């Protein structure tokens, strides 16, 4: 019998009931050929990996900086899903406890979940040790928690801001477990524009109103240039006696105030 005639015969493994397929022969197409081709049992060739079908683009602008009167925290309120604006009223500053604030940049669900979990861990720490957790310890807790999931698709870039026995504290933590202490940070797609304003106007000796104006101006400039940032500017001030919410200004109103300004 010729070899060609053997290869042309249909494979019996695709009959109804074999391997519990119930007649779905298409489920056992192991190779590049059709199920009736004898070559269908050959190992599949290595091809080009399939590209992700959906690419979610993250966009936001958040900032925080330390100065002699505490820590200023500001953020926009726009949430995007790819090229679509999902919301204009997202609260991107998370109130962890009366002395700690966190910001959201990256995946909204990731940031919200991990910072709310951090709030519970901070409360447990206080109950066990009978004292407030420090800003450094809180940021280290968050970094340790997310590091366990490194490489698993988390998307988070947050700033932990607060006041403890050492004074004002500011740390940047991301989903890779990185943790950095600093005086000024801006995170998000509009951060390059916010940094431009902060680098020019920031000083540790700023007065309170000057610091408020600098934060508003920095977020406004980011929303003006970055399509993924917008909505309103939420402004917080962390002081020795706890944080306060200073204001929430629509960027359209800030445009009337700052457009044409040269500084």
Curated annotation (Swiss-Prot):
CDD domains: proteasome_beta_type_5
Pfam families: Proteasome
Any one GO MF annotation of this record: endopeptidase activity
Reactions listed under catalytic activity: Cleavage of peptide bonds with very broad specificity
Binding-site residues for bortezomib, renumbered to this chain: 108
Annotated function: Component of the 20S core proteasome complex involved in the proteolytic degradation of most intracellular proteins. This complex plays numerous essential roles within the cell by associating with different regulatory particles. Associated with two 19S regulatory particles, forms the 26S proteasome and thus participates in the ATP-dependent degradation of ubiquitinated proteins.
Name of this protein: Proteasome subunit beta type-5
Organism the protein comes from: Bos taurus
GN (gene name): PSMB5
């Amino acid at each position: 019998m010729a070899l060609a005639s053997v290869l042309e015969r249909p494979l019996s493994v695709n009959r109804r009931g074999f391997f519990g397929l119930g007649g779905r022969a298409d489920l056992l197409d192991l190779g590049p050929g059709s199920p009736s081709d004898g070559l269908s049992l050959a190992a599949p060739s290595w091809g080009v990996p399939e590209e992700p079908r959906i690419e979610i683009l993250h966009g936001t602008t958040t900032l925080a900086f330390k100065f002699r009167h505490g820590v200023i925290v500001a953020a926009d309120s726009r949430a995007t899903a790819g090229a679509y604006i999902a919301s204009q009223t997202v609260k991107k500053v998370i109130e962890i406890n009366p002395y700690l604030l966190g910001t959201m940049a990256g995946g909204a669900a990731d940031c919200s979940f991990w910072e709310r979990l951090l709030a519970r861990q901070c409360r447990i720490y206080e109950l066990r040790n009978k004292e407030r957790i420090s800003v450094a310890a809180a940021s280290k807790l968050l970094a340790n928690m997310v590091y366990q999931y490194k490489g698993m698709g988390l998307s988070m870039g947050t700033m932990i801001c607060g006041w403890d026995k050492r004074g004002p504290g500011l740390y940047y933590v991301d989903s890779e477990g990185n943790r950095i202490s600093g005086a000024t940070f801006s995170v998000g797609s509009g951060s390059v524009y916010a940094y431009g304003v902060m680098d020019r106007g920031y000083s540790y000796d700023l007065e309170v109103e000057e610091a408020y104006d600098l934060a508003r101006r920095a977020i406004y400039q980011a929303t003006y240039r970055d399509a993924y940032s917008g909505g309103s500017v939420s402004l917080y001030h962390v002081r020795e006696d706890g944080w306060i919410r200073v204001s929430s200004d629509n960027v359209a109103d800030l445009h009337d105030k700052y457009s044409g300004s040269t500084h």
